[in-house]
Amino acid sequence: MSILSFLLGEKKKSASVAKERLQLIIAHERVGGRPPADYLPALQKELVAVISKYVQISNDDIRVSLERQDDLEVLEVKIEIPQA
């Protein structure tokens, strides 16, 4: 972080904000919150809304899944972006 960005209060990038949100959701799940199926549809809608700001996509162009194997959780996001 440079002194100038510190003094002017540089905005966080949307990717870093999204990453923090996903980390919070997964951490909440590990503690024993609600089942993962509850938030995945909402997460998918939010991802479509954010990506649609930059590229035209539909709900069918994105897939979100959470797989659990023993102590490992994998959140997988697949996005089909149309060719320009």
UniProtKB/Swiss-Prot annotation:
Signal peptide: none annotated. Keywords: Cell cycle, Cell division. InterPro entries: MinE, MinE_sf. It holds the Pfam family MinE. GO terms for biological process: cell division; regulation of division septum assembly. It comes from the Bacteria. Coiled coil: none annotated. Belongs to the MinE family. Prevents the cell division inhibition by proteins MinC and MinD at internal division sites while permitting inhibition at polar sites. This ensures cell division at the proper site by restricting the formation of a division septum at the midpoint of the long axis of the cell. This is Cell division topological specificity factor. It comes from Burkholderia multivorans (strain ATCC 17616 / 249). The gene is minE.
